[in-house]
Amino acid sequence: MTQLKGILPALVTPFDKAGNVNYDMLGNIIEFQLKAGVTGFVPLGSTGEYYALTNQERRQILSTVREVVGDRGVLIAGANGSCTREVIEQVKQTRDAGYTNLLIAPPYYALPSQDELIGHYQAILDAAPDINVVLYNYPVRTNVEVGFTVLDAFKDNKRVIAIKESSGNLLRAIEIGNTYKDNYQLSCGSDDQALDFFLWGASSWICGPANCLTQQVCDFYSKYTSGDLN
């Protein structure tokens, strides 16, 4: 199973003044973050503005990230959309680009029930049997929570490997860390609660500030893992 550990930047997508993706700058950002000590990357997430990109731009971003990173870090790509069919198309496109670990949020706008959300994730797993899923709970953006009913449904599925928890509800994160510690890797998605997440069992931080405070974030994690909490 892929291990999510340490600082995983939620990669920004750099644009030039004309609104085109600046792939050279993307490569420079990745190299800078690797030198600072990050352990992997998450392209095409919320911070990467996947919703503002064409499919061709998404494919090129995936290719650029994979080419630059190589075997120097874990890669988890966002693959999201407003309905199950669209997400499956994004999943297959992402898989074809060489990614096997995908960050998948609930479909936005449709507001599925928890049972429908279980069906959504199961359809994705069935359509792409060679990928792993990182659940993405960000209800302020999707208006749908990846609830405990969903976590219960997939807790024994070895291909649903983790959850990025971005609700901002620390008590929920603590409950996930306690109740599902043997089922899911917990990744912090609430940047202002990173230390709390690590103290309560998170193994990684999918981190927006790593795009602008890279060394500080990596130093924070290094001090935490060495026991220096001062």
Predicted regions, residues:
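Active-site beta->alpha loop and helix N-cap motifs at the rims of alpha/beta catalytic domains
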Residues: 2-145
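Catalytic alpha/beta core domains of metabolic enzymes, predominantly
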Residues: 125-127, 141-230
